[in-house]
Amino acid sequence: MREYVIRPLVIGANETDQGIMTYLRGYGQRIWIPIYAFYLEGGPEKILVDTGLEQFMVPPEVSKKYGLEILEFEDALATVGLRPEDIDLIIHTHLHNDHCENDTKCTNATVIAQRKEYEFFKNPHPI
C-alpha cells in the first residue's frame, strides 16, 4: 500500500462570529479561522485537498497571535516545491468558496467533488 505524507498549507483566514463554529457558545465574539489546503505527498500524482481562498487580508498581528504563516496560494505551494500548474488532482471536501477559490489556477488538474455537492453548487437553494 502506498504511503502518503499530508502537508497542511494555510491559504487564507476568515474572521467570523465564534458562535457559528462553537454551537451556542461565544456568540458576538469575533475570531479568526485559518483556511487550509492539504498536499498529499508520496504518490505519482500531485494531489491537493481543497485550494483555499483566493483573496484575503489578514492583519499581521493575527498571524503572530495564532503562530500561523498565512500565505497566498502560489507561495504556499512553493513551500512544498510546487506551482499551481503542477497539480494533477484536486479533491474537494465541499464547495464553499473558502475551499475552492484557487481551482482555476491549477490549469492541469482534474477536480473531484461529491455529486450531490456539485448539484447543489450548480443550483443552490434560493434565499
Residue ranges and their predicted role:
Residues 13-75:
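Conserved beta-strand hairpin/beta-sheet module of binuclear metal-dependent hydrolase folds
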Residues 8-10, 113:
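Structural signal for conserved beta-strand scaffold positions within catalytic alpha/beta enzyme cores
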Residues 2-7:
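Extreme N-terminal starter segment of soluble prokaryotic enzymes
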